[in-house]
Amino acid sequence: ILAGYGYDMIGVDNSGDMLELAMEKRLASGHDILYLLQDMREFELYGTVRAVVSVCDSVNYITEPEELAEVFRLVNNYLDPGGLFLFDFNTEYKYREVMGDCTIAEDRGDCSFIWDNCYYEEEKINEYDLTLFIREGSDDNGALYRKYRETHFQRGYTLEEIRELLSSAGLVFQAAYDMDTGEAAWEKSERICVIARECGKRPPEESGPAQEAGESRQAQGAREV
């Protein structure tokens, strides 16, 4: 999506299967996107970038706060001076009060799933077993459903914890929005989008007013996207 807006993109994922799917979409889109097979806790780039974007509650998969602080430190390291970091996360409130211990099942025609959820409040760990039934073939050729099973572990974080971890990594918190309402995040937000900024690096001394104005416009575009 962002490549379609004209941004030069680098994609990082720890799953070869996910990257393979991404590369298939890249081929279909015609965009020039670099993909890297890396663990976010140890990711390396070839230089700094103007923005880092993390979506689909990826940070919740980092279940140790110390490791998440290291992820944020790496983000800060690879951001340009004043660069933006945008990410979303599921809150502890959502896991504790909304999800809890439950089973969710849904039939979507070509695929169905069973989601068995369990939240361990003391450890702040949400575990869910996901069983998928994916349709293959057509009715004319004898369609069948192939079964897949996955187990996921995610940690519930509060916004206060996220802000403290950002600060410990040298990033400056800018804003947090409830992803259901678009309004400012509050204590009962289930999913939050956070905007943070790098502030520790100095821009090149030769940067003139025109260049700085251009960077300001590009940063504004990143916020709007």
Predicted regions and their residues:
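Conserved beta-strand segments of alpha/beta enzyme cores
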Residues: 8, 32-34, 112, 172-175
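SAM-dependent methyltransferase
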Residues: 86-165, 225
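A short SAM/SAH-binding and catalytic strip from SAM-dependent methyltransferases
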Residues: 49-67
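C-terminal lobe and adjacent flexible extensions of AdoMet/dcAdoMet transferase-like proteins
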Residues: 153-212, 221-225
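A short acidic, Gly/Pro-enriched loop at the edge of an enzyme's catalytic core
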Residues: 41-51
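Class I SAM-dependent methyltransferase SAM/SAH-binding core
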Residues: 1-42
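A short, glycine/Asx- and small/polar-enriched loop/turn
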Residues: 49, 124-126, 187-192
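A short glycine-rich, Lys/Arg-flanked "PGG" loop and its adjoining helix->strand segment in the class I
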Residues: 69-84
